[in-house]
Design a protein with these regions (language model features):
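Phosphate-binding site recognition
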Residues: 1-176
Length: 176
């Protein structure tokens, strides 16, 4: 999906809960990164957003919402560039307050496409065989395969660990 969107749109925005892998996924698809958690980069972006934008695309702008003015600068840069896949924006789904929201003048429609990212599913974690889905059960579809039941300990462990990529491979003690 990300590769297709980078070929189709000039910028993409990846949103989702903290720790679900937005930055890692973005870096996997990007060729350069600006981390706005770095105070010096953030100062540059506040001074003049164009100072952090470069031609080594796709450029990942991590935690873009820390400098809301970047949204319009990126939108304008998308208008100036003929190429697709210029920017990957990551960060919080919500700006901190109304004052910050007021700093964004344009929606980015047609230039910046939003991708929602979620924690990993039990199938992605290798804990499900994809025989039964919640949607199948909701739609009352016939279930034709038996699945080895999880014991209560395994179900509890999946709930506690969640679908966070950073938890993969941790022992029970480490993930607690």
């Amino acid at each position: 999906t990300i590769e297709l969107y980078l070929k189709t749109f000039k910028a993409i925005q990846i949103v989702g809960p903290k720790w679900c892998g937005k930055t890692w996924t973005s870096m996997h698809h990007g060729n350069s990164i600006v981390r706005l958690t770095d105070i010096e980069k953030r100062k540059l972006a506040i001074l003049n957003p164009k100072l952090i934008l470069n031609e080594n695309i796709p450029e990942v702008i991590d935690e873009w919402q820390l400098v809301p003015e970047l949204w319009d600068a990126i939108r304008n840069e998308c208008d100036l560039r003929a190429s697709k896949g210029n920017f990957i924006l990551t960060g919080s789904t919500a700006l901190l307050d109304k004052e910050e929201k007021s700093k964004i003048k344009h929606t980015g429609t047609g230039r910046i496409i939003k991708i929602n990212m979620f924690p990993m599913t039990t199938l992605e974690l290798g804990k499900s065989l994809d025989y039964i889905s919640l949607m199948d059960m909701y739609e009352e579809k016939e279930i034709n395969k038996l699945v080895d039941p999880f014991d209560i300990y395994e179900i509890t462990r999946l709930i506690i660990n969640g679908g966070w990529p950073e938890n993969l491979g941790l022992s029970n003690l480490e993930s607690d």
